[in-house]
Amino acid sequence: MDVQEPPNFSTGLVAELHAPLRSAGVPDPEPYAAFIAASGEPALELGCGQGDPLLALRARGLDVEGLDASADRLARLRLRAEADGVEVVVHHSTIEAMELRRRYQSIFLAGPTFNLLPDDDTAWHALDRIRAHLEPGGAALVPLFIPERTPRSTFGVARTHITADGTEMRVTAVSETRDVAQRLQVTVLRYELIGSDGGVDRVERPWVLHWHTQDGFRSLAEEAGLTVSTVLRPDGRPAEPDDTTFAFRLTPDPAWDRPRTSRPTGGGAMMAAAMFGLEQAIFGERPKVQVVAEAEADGLDRGDIELDLDDPARSRITIQEEE
């Protein structure tokens, strides 16, 4: 199955309608507060979205930062934080490309956001970045699930929310494909905003879910230099092999020395970082953006990619050979 996913699912209208239409409710901050208490501060929430549970954890005085790939969702988070009088530090990046100056005792995802990474290569790069941002002795919490098919009876049936001024918000499952061999399910969702004047804004996005078996994810984590300490059910009990919802607690392997040949991508990581930078430039966040990423191909060390949309002729890609 070939998937052409937009740069980020949660942009524009989707970001606007996500919170009112979400079916899972607001994440309970308690499990994540307990994880931070056990693993230590500072902490980092990956895929923090519009601020749940990040802002609740910050309101408790915990040293927690956030990271998300959607600038639109982060903008909404900042507005909420300002309204609530909560100071918060957030970073705009994908997980697999993050290069932060700080290291953390605790890194976590509040829900199975990791399933949104579309393939094993991207997941490996994300785990590699998680390991690189953990302090020695720190821990990461990665919830995962194996999705079921969307019931046929729900296709074409909208989930709705009506605001006080009569505006109607809708999300509808339009179609779905599932590839068990690739562990990939793609559901096309239609988001609609219907104003009280009858005007309609509409967008369709592919919701890509890539799932992992427990054994497969364990191997992937170990390839990225992480050790599995526990695999738990949502209720905190040890996961059984046939469970479809589980969370991995990972710690950095102190003896791990990353081989140059692990997960070779022929520069794919660098290109992913470049495309992320290009997205930001196109949407006007930075007229000129420089992205530095690691190239995994043999014989390559680091590369500089500089994109200048004001003068494309000045854009450049420089690859440095290993010393």
State the predicted function of each range.
Residues 52-97:
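Class I SAM-dependent methyltransferase SAM/SAH-binding core
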Residues 99-106:
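A short acidic, Gly/Pro-enriched loop at the edge of an enzyme's catalytic core
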Residues 47-49:
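Class I SAM-dependent methyltransferase "Motif I" SAM/SAH-binding loop
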Residues 124-136:
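A short glycine-rich, Lys/Arg-flanked "PGG" loop and its adjoining helix->strand segment in the class I
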Residues 253-276, 280-323:
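Intrinsic, low-complexity terminal and presequence regions
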Residues 141-215:
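SAM-dependent methyltransferase
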Residues 208-252:
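C-terminal lobe and adjacent flexible extensions of AdoMet/dcAdoMet transferase-like proteins
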Residues 1-41, 52:
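Conserved class I S-adenosyl-L-methionine
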